[in-house]
């Protein structure tokens, strides 16, 4: 078998090689380049949306300081109170027009209870301002056996400081029983009520 000659000579092959255009590698698509970069998350977690701890702490401290200031300015402590057992007798006729009118509709006990409730409220204010020391302590009572047997009993809560002041005035030696002291206190409260009533009507 014979050797075939190349169709192109060496010189022609070199000229063809020089005339070929250079192979240009295409650049990567933009989408491909961008896909290699880290993308920010589309949705933030709840922890990412929370405020910075330092800011939250400052806000909490400010609110707490405001609350402490308000509490310091307001007094929420109620005064200590004590229960006092009270008793009183109805007044004699014409001592109190209010009582005389009430017994036309209610029993003597019920009528005196209605007045005593009001009298004790007023007398508590007198204990607070000290005016009870110059006020009357008693009033005329009936002399009949039936009317003497009527005794109204009740109880009321008083501030301890006011009861101490009343005891020093009505029982300076501290020898009275609790019920005896309560009778004096209720009698004085009614005496003040009847005295004011008479002064208003005169």
Curated annotation (Swiss-Prot):
It comes from the Bacteria. One of its GO terms (biological process) is regulation of DNA-templated transcription. Residues 21-66 are annotated as: Disordered. SUPFAM superfamilies: Ribbon-helix-helix. One of its GO terms (molecular function) is DNA binding. Keywords: Crown gall tumor, Plasmid. Disulfide bonds: none annotated. NCBIfam families: PRK13862.1. It comes from Agrobacterium fabrum (strain C58 / ATCC 33970). This is Protein virC2. The Ti plasmid contains at least six transcriptional units, designated vir loci, which are essential for efficient crown-gall tumorigenesis.
